Structures are given as C-alpha cells and as structure tokens.
Amino acid sequence: MASLHDVARLAGVSKSTVSRVINDEYGVKEATKQKVRQAVAECGYVPNQVAKDLKEESSAIIVQDKTGKVLFVKEGALEQDEIAKVIELIKQNI
C-alpha cells in the first residue's frame, strides 16, 4: 500500500504539498497539483480515514459481533439511547 511519502517522492514534492493537494487546500500551483494527482494515481494511494480522524480528534466505535459482522459508528452519528444499545452489544460480545 502506497504512503504519502511514496506519493511525495514520485511527484518530487514534500509530504505537506501532497497533503494540501489531497485536502484541496490553497497555495499549490496547478502544475504541482497535476504532478501530485498523477503520482497518486500511479501509486494507487488511498488516504487513511482512521489516521485522518485521529488527527482531527474524531473518534468512532468499532464492534465485531459473534458472527463476525463489524459495526462502525462515527462519533456524533448516534443519539444517547443508541449509544446505550451499542454499549450493550459490546457487553454481550465480550
């Protein structure tokens, strides 16, 4: 799996430039954006959502039940009573 570092090396730019292009931030010339996008495509780079959430101090609940099903719930996606149900599910599967 390609990393941000791999994309930066291939495009000949810094990791912060790659990040700015991926996050569609200002301050990057169009020619540089094209080089980075080409490198992303060549490497098959896919941003890591978990890492992004950690950086943004966002969190989620991930639970695997007895059948192997995985439940992923992003913070703020549930009401208080629903959180209680998720906690109960966790307790049942410990």
Swiss-Prot record:
<feature type="DNA-binding region" description="H-T-H motif">
    <location>
        <begin position="4"/>
        <end position="23"/>
    </location>
</feature>
<dbReference type="GO" id="GO:0003700">
    <property type="term" value="F:DNA-binding transcription factor activity"/>
</dbReference>
<dbReference type="GO" id="GO:0000976">
    <property type="term" value="F:transcription cis-regulatory region binding"/>
</dbReference>
<dbReference type="Pfam" id="PF00356">
    <property type="entry name" value="LacI"/>
</dbReference>
<protein>
    <recommendedName>
        <fullName>Sucrose operon repressor</fullName>
    </recommendedName>
</protein>
<feature type="domain" description="HTH lacI-type">
    <location>
        <begin position="1"/>
        <end position="56"/>
    </location>
</feature>
<keyword id="KW-0804">Transcription</keyword>
<keyword id="KW-0678">Repressor</keyword>
<comment type="function">
    <text>Repressor for the scr operon. Binds D-fructose as an inducer.</text>
</comment>
<keyword id="KW-0238">DNA-binding</keyword>
<dbReference type="Pfam" id="PF09695">
    <property type="entry name" value="YtfJ_HI0045"/>
</dbReference>
<keyword id="KW-0805">Transcription regulation</keyword>
<dbReference type="InterPro" id="IPR006513">
    <property type="entry name" value="YtfJ_HI0045"/>
</dbReference>
<dbReference type="InterPro" id="IPR010982">
    <property type="entry name" value="Lambda_DNA-bd_dom_sf"/>
</dbReference>
<dbReference type="InterPro" id="IPR000843">
    <property type="entry name" value="HTH_LacI"/>
</dbReference>
